[in-house]
């Protein structure tokens, strides 16, 4: 497997979510993920509770392939970063074990201040060091 430093991958991964240029975002998606790669999100507790109230035992949100990943990242950018209030940053301490990278991230106010959100990311990599599956667990 490609020699990848976990913290470097974490920085590139998190930078993608704050990238304002749509073409650069798409290029970063294609560089980070393997073709057909997936982003699987455990939704926030509020959404899980609403789903349970509707009779769903579990709720998982998924994006597969470059086009769906592009939509997912773009919508996150538009909601959280584009208005100019927040940005995302990787926290220190990313680690790699074989083909798995674990990292933590946070959403912070532009200009500094305490994190208002964040989460855990578990990335499964292919033999070329590209993401095949990205498991996101939001929440601080």
Model-derived regions, located:
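C-terminal and inter-domain tail/linker signature
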Residues: 1-140
């Amino acid at each position: 497997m490609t020699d990848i430093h976990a913290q470097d991958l974490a920085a590139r991964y998190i930078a993608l979510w704050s990238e304002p240029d749509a073409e650069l975002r798409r290029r970063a998606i294609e560089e980070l993920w393997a073709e057909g790669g997936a982003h699987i999100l455990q939704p926030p507790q509020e959404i899980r509770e609403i789903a349970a109230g509707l009779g769903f035992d579990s709720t998982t949100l998924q994006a597969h392939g470059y086009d769906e990943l592009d939509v997912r990242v773009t919508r996150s950018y538009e909601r959280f970063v584009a208005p100019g209030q927040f940005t995302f940053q990787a926290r220190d301490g990313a680690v790699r074990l074989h083909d798995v990278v674990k990292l933590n991230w946070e959403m912070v106010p532009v200009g500094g201040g305490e994190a208002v959100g964040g989460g855990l990311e578990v990335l499964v990599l292919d033999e070329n060091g590209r993401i095949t599956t990205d498991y996101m667990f939001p929440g601080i």
